[in-house]
Amino acid sequence: MAVTMYYEEDVEVAALAGKKIAVIGYGSQGHAHAQNLRDSGHDVIIGVRQGKSFDRAKEDGFETFEVGEAVAKADVIMVLAPDELQQSIYEEDIKPNLKSGSALGFAHGFNIHFGYIEVPEDVDVFMVAPKAPGHLVRRTFTEGFGTPALFVSHQNATGHAREIAMDWAKGIGCARVGIIETTFKEETEEDLFGEQAVLCGGLTALVEAGFETLTEARYAGELAYFEVLHEMKLIVDLMYEGGFTKMRQSISNTAEFGDYVTGPRIITDEVKKNMKLVLADIQSGKFAQDFVDDFKAGRPKLTAYREAAKNLEIEKIGAELRKAMPFTQSGDDDAFKIYQ
């Protein structure tokens, strides 16, 4: 299905002009949205609970308040706290202070789409979802361009929800490179599927399986690390720049031939069937409920998964090898740690 890409010149209404904007949360996305909007001339305050993020926002020059106070002062509110915290923040701090005719925004549709947050009918609901982590949203903005984003007008109580979403996307720099209109359902389900089946879950499982295959065949773990993980960035960067075509033009004929004949042996029809099952769990809300239930129980499953992942042999070997490769580290990593 074809989509329309919108740019700065398509944002015809300065819907945020003269409005008080509250960014709720000052983590990876929160600091980027807030700083970019401020640099674009908007009136931005921060709503965040006491702690490191509260202190960081004040150090960065923002008027900073407890969440409820910030919401009460604002005309447009953007919720950029982690997904698992948004429901409680909304019920305890946002909902009691939300004014009729105000606008409530999100950068991911999880809580709205799956029904964990229900907004009164007299409030606009919108989304602006940059397709990049917060430190890149900020860095690319300061470099004079930006990152692509999705935007949604979900609940149009005032008749201006779409204009607010587009002006927000412009204010954080995304409309410089292009924004696409979508729905909460589409953004949420596609985003979760991409993370689980390909970008995070699928990729790490593939790398780990490749590493284990080589080391179980008595190849050196250090060499296996280079072959299945370290060189991944080189290939992904080529695809990022020019798709499969540029990647295949840049590798050897041997590698390209192996790509065509072996890829289908790894990603079989059975794998695709499993991907469809993963998508079904997302669409039905099963994954969302499992995630929320684990959080409410104190994260026993997530904690166990993290502990097991930390102890993987590929992680231990990689940590040692990267000590001799300072070029694998970057300032962006530091920025992400500061604002997560």
From Swiss-Prot:
One of its GO terms (biological process) is isoleucine biosynthetic process. Gene3D superfamilies: 6.10.240.10, NAD(P)-binding Rossmann-like Domain (3.40.50.720). It catalyses: (2R)-2,3-dihydroxy-3-methylbutanoate + NADP(+) = (2S)-2-acetolactate + NADPH + H(+); (2R,3R)-2,3-dihydroxy-3-methylpentanoate + NADP(+) = (S)-2-ethyl-2-hydroxy-3-oxobutanoate + NADPH + H(+). Pathway: Amino-acid biosynthesis; L-isoleucine biosynthesis; L-isoleucine from 2-oxobutanoate: step 2/4; Amino-acid biosynthesis; L-valine biosynthesis; L-valine from pyruvate: step 2/4. Binds 2 magnesium ions per subunit. InterPro entries: 6-PGluconate_DH-like_C_sf (IPR008927), KARI (IPR013023), KARI_C (IPR000506), KARI_N (IPR013116), KARI_prok (IPR014359), NAD(P)-bd_dom_sf (IPR036291). It comes from the Bacteria. One of its GO terms (molecular function) is magnesium ion binding. NADP(+) binds at Y26, G27, S28, Q29, R49, S53, D83, E84, L85, Q86, G134. This is Ketol-acid reductoisomerase (NADP(+)). It comes from Lactococcus lactis subsp. cremoris (strain SK11).
